[in-house]
UniProtKB/Swiss-Prot annotation:
This is one of the proteins that binds to the 5S RNA in the ribosome where it forms part of the central protuberance. Residues 184-208 are annotated as: Disordered. Keywords: Ribonucleoprotein, Ribosomal protein, RNA-binding, rRNA-binding. It comes from Ehrlichia ruminantium (strain Gardel). Residues 187-208 have a biased composition (Low complexity). It comes from the Bacteria. CDD domains: Ribosomal_L25_TL5_CTC (cd00495). The lineage of its organism: Bacteria, Pseudomonadati, Pseudomonadota, Alphaproteobacteria, Rickettsiales. InterPro entries: Rbsml_bL25/Gln-tRNA_synth_N, Ribosomal_bL25/Gln-tRNA_synth, Ribosomal_bL25_b-dom, Ribosomal_bL25_C, Ribosomal_bL25_long, Ribosomal_L25_dom, Ribosomal_uL5_bac-type. Belongs to the bacterial ribosomal protein bL25 family. CTC subfamily. GO terms for cellular component: cytosolic large ribosomal subunit. One of its GO terms (molecular function) is 5S rRNA binding. This is Large ribosomal subunit protein bL25.
Length: 208
């Protein structure tokens, strides 16, 4: 595990919980939060609104290990949920999960599609169809991926890229409901689709 994969934040323990104390924290520029996990008692904490927002905007926190410094103690966690105000969109509460470095975790990772302009099928007028923009994976905390790259350069019309085509580390397992799902396809050219649609419309009219 390298420093590049860890986001560090400061946190403080909450002495009081509930609606009233949480409102007071928010008025004072803090965000109420909780850390939970198997075989661990929930930990009620609060974060600096300013610090959390700066980290939240600069990194995909959902795919980073977070080192929470709570007083003199450090806890490694994952961010699992953020609650926002329905009107102001201000962050109201954050849920974290304790991490056991020897236990695999499940996490959703974004797919990054590269070389679309070099894609053989797109150059020939094909239509790019992206079916999945994220993947659910299982791995140890030190093997978390911030993103997964999907290279479109050699994708031709009528062909697809599946999960099995990805070059994933051996310690990462994809956990999706569908076995070996299709991630992206290249369908026929736009003109072909327009022609096909026109022919279908004509046939329907003649049957009427």
């Amino acid at each position: 595990m390298t420093d590049q994969t860890i986001v560090k934040m400061n946190a403080e323990l909450r002495n009081s919980v509930g609606t009233g104390p949480s409102r007071t924290l928010r008025r004072n520029g803090a965000i109420p939060a909780v850390v939970y996990g198997k075989h661990r008692s929930p930990l009620s904490i609060y974060l600096s609104d300013r610090e959390f927002l700066s980290k939240y905007r600069s990194a995909a926190l959902s795919t980073h290990l977070i080192e929470l410094e709570i007083g003199e103690k450090k806890e490694y966690v994952l961010m699992r949920d953020i609650q926002k105000h329905p009107v102001t969109d201000r962050i109201q509460h954050v849920d974290f999960q304790f991490i056991d470095h020897g236990t695999e975790i499940k996490i959703e990772v974004p797919l990054v599609f590269v070389n679309e302009q070099r894609c053989v099928g797109v150059k020939k007028g094909g239509v790019l169809n992206i079916l999945h923009r994220t993947l659910h994976i299982k791995c140890l905390p030190n093997a978390i991926l911030q993103s997964i790259e999907v290279d479109l350069a050699n994708l031709t019309i009528g062909h697809s890229i599946h999960v099995s085509d990805l070059n994933l580390p051996s310690e990462v397992t994809v956990v999706m409901k569908e076995h070996n799902p299709t991630l992206v396809t290249i369908s026929g050219t736009s003109s072909d689709q327009d022609t096909s649609g026109g022919e279908s419309s004509g046939t329907t009219t003649s049957e009427d």
